[in-house]
Every structure is written in C-alpha cells, then in structure tokens.
Amino acid sequence: MSGRSFMLATRVPMSRTGFEAWLDTPPPSLDVIENPAAMWTGWAAAGDAADWDLTAFADSPHIVAAMRADQRKTPRELLTDRVKTGGCVARHRDEALELYLYDYHADFYRTRTELLMLAGAGRYADVGAHPVLFWGGNVYADLPIAGDPPLSVLVVSRAGAHFVDRYPIDALVESLRPIEAAFLARYEGDGSAEPDLTDAVDPDLRP
C-alpha cells in the first residue's frame, strides 16, 4: 500500500441519532471553515496554496463540475461510494463517528469534499473540539510515524471548523489506533476473499 496516497482519520463523539442525521445532510458551504486558506499552514505542505477554488483545473471544467457535484452529495452517498471501492472505515462506534479514508494514487483535491463533509459533522457532535487528521504523500496508508508531520489538522465543533497550525500529533495518532486497526484488518489475507465489512463499516452504509 505504498505510493502517492492521501488519508483522513477522525473520531467525533456524537449520538447514534446525530450520526444518522449527519449521514443525510449535504456538506455545508466553505463558510463553515473559519480559515480555509490556512489548510496547509504549519505542516508538511506549508506555503502551498489551499486552492479551494480549484484553479488547478481551470482548463478542465468537467473535472471541476464533477468535484462540485460531489460537494452536493450527502455523507451517506459519499461514503456508500467509498465502501464499494474499499479503502475506508466508516462507522458509528462507542457513541462516536469513526472514519479512516484512504485514496491510493490520488490527488488531494478530493479531500476537500471530505473535509467539508466532516466540518458538517460538528453540528451533530458532542460539545468540544474534535480533530481531523489529514496526511499523505509517498507513504503507506498507516497513521503517521512519530516525527512525520501531517498535511493538515482540521478541528470541528458545534460552532464550525478551523484549521490549526499546531497540535499534539503523537497523542492524536494514538487515539486513532483502534480505527487504524480496523482499516488494516480489511487488507489481511491473500486478497482472494471479499473483505469482511462487519467491523469497518456501519450497517447503514453496507451494500
């Protein structure tokens, strides 16, 4: 599982009722994030443009249209598509939304939709500030090794969301280990059998 890959992981405490409501609520607009231009600030891609306007695809309007269409899909639609192709944990477990999303040989533009999707989860979250870890590059799909900076950290809450330029990453990584374990378990075996979705995917999202 090496190659240019991008991953998101989070654990956002919320009730089952909140989780189900979030699944059927389209992602909010970019205004939900207080400082979208600061997506890379302080981390491995510091200095790069956030490019929420998708100017990199100015000559490919069909790509921009497809990305904008994804931003109008509900989390249920986005995650159901994910489950079909593998590479994710998406579940409500122990009174929390747990996600681990993996894009192999991809670019990080798709992640903008997923960050908006998770920013929208704050509306249904328990009181508090809840981090979303975004990392990737020419790395494995495992959580970052100690000392390796992520690409970004988004903090979501009932008040909205914002990017931060520092965060106790080692502690965050350790808190995400159980979700990582469920993700890695999907790739056990020789690949001849269909992956067991029981632990990794919520019943509401299974085929």
State where each predicted segment sits.
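Short N-terminal segments
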Residues: 40-52, 57
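Charged interaction segments
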Residues: 52-207
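Short, extreme N-terminal segment that most often corresponds to the first beta-strand
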Residues: 1-45, 207
